[in-house]
Amino acid sequence: MFAIFVGTIIGCITQPMPIGAVSIIGFTLTVLVGVIDTKTAVQGFGNPSIWLIAMAFFISRGFVKTGLGRRIALQFVRLFGKKTLGLAYSLVGVDLILAPATPSNTARAGGIMFPIIQSLSKSFDSDPKQGTERKVGSFLIFTEFHGNLITAAMFLTAMAGNLLAQNLAEKTAHVHVTWMNWFLAAIVPGIVSLIVIPFIIYKMYPPTVKETPDAKDWAENELADMGSIAKAEKFMIGVFIIALLLWVVGSFIGVDATLTAFIALSLLLITGVLDWKDILNETGAWNTLVWFSVLVMMADQLNQLGFIPWLSHTIANSLGGLSWPVVLVILIIFYFYSHYLFASSTAHVSAMYAALLGVAVVAGAPPLFSALMLGFFGNLMASTTHYSSGPAPILYAAGYVTQKRWWLMNLALGCLLYTSPSPRDKARSRMPSSA
């Protein structure tokens, strides 16, 4: 089982063929060699967390189709875009608002934020083809990259890998991670990071244009072209609010996160915001549903067959004599910097999360705290390379930031992340006392 799992993960990383195809081949081999039977293998496709991911993909399509995501972004630019730093904060704010209902940070960064940043940059004659990328474009691109990763770490439903981590935590350490306890643990360090990181980037990599008085006029013109808010956008706002409320209070009224997502999608279909063709055309959701289900099934089998517990105890014994805080820090640092070998955050979570969580728990670390910290860093570790995750190649390929600059600044910001204890301490203090 382990050999097939490793082979599948390597295939997901190197992608000699699409990740879904690699997963199907791995699934077939698992049954063919007799590790498990077909009935057991297909159980992964009934996992509620995986269906939550698919439903949230469909919901996020509503933001794009109705134009609501773009309208929100333009409103932020209109209100806060008089200075370049304020412009960056406004864009990060939009990402923050959209994050809870968008399980693809690639969709947020590439489908909504990147077109806005490109248009803004061009309006200030900031173009890498003309050698003027440093005017505003470089700063906005790099700030959005880091802001996107932070917002992805703040909400359970903001990145597909978070929901995989939730599932693995339940199966590996019997830790029940909910939307609410993830949010409560992440909110303070997340907000602090969203305030501090753009300012640090502003000092490290300052734009040559500090004032952007024309941004407000540009945004107002774009909003005028969009016209008044449409009925479909109003429905989208209403459904989004209902989904957020149910994600927050659902555990108290017997409505879990997956059912909430199904309710939201049903409302979007009933109101006509989305039609069935939209659902069928959301290939990212169906693709994720297939390969995620296979990887979760494999990881679950490794745990049931005793491999993950054995590996966790073996590594924990090699770290014998160290206190659990030291062990957890070592594991997080290893988790973070090993991402240089990965081109997908979700693939990295699939490969290492369960084993590292098992080691932390065996070493005596609080299970929920360990699960959440590794969950957060499953997003933050993508702040390493220009191929680290879906948003990275999209933003890097625009040409506003060179590869050398991208790597060096990420290295510096990564060091800052570990030398500043306050966000981690605050996460610890905000952690719910029970799972």
Regions found by a protein language model. Name each.
Residues 122-135, 204-238:
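Intrinsically disordered, low-complexity non-transmembrane regions of multi-pass membrane transporters
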Residues 7-24, 41, 199-203, 230, ...:
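Flexible hinge motifs at transmembrane-helix junctions and intramembrane kinks/re-entrant loops
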